């Protein structure tokens, strides 16, 4: 939400805090021998200023990351295929061995 303020130093601090938090979570998942997915639903901090120099506080259409960290030894990996937000839940369900409901329109991005 900090990106919506248009305050660049606050957005930088927020990104750094999230980065540190993700590192802690991934370390815990590694110790547990688990699997973690990291993603976002939209961009915002990637464009903090509009063309005229005013604060840009809206979402952007920039691609967002979708990363898989498999510490389970199962050899899970993403296919590298371009995906969409609707593909995230099917990918996670497939990784957990759960059938993807037919109502879901996305596909698994596992290789």
Can you name each region flagged by the protein language model?
Residues 1-111:
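Feature captures the catalytic ectodomains and active-site-proximal regions of enzymes
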């Amino acid at each position: 939400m900090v990106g919506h303020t248009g305050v660049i130093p606050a957005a930088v601090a927020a990104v750094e805090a999230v980065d540190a938090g993700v590192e802690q979570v991934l370390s815990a998942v590694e110790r547990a021998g688990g699997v973690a997915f990291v993603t976002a639903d939209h961009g915002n901090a990637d464009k903090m200023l509009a063309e005229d120099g005013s604060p840009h506080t809206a979402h952007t259409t920039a691609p967002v990351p979708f990363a898989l960290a498999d510490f389970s030894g199962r050899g899970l990996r993403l296919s590298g295929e371009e995906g969409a937000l609707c593909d995230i839940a099917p990918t996670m369900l497939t990784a957990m061995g759960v059938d993807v409901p037919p109502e879901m329109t996305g596909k698994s991005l596992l290789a």
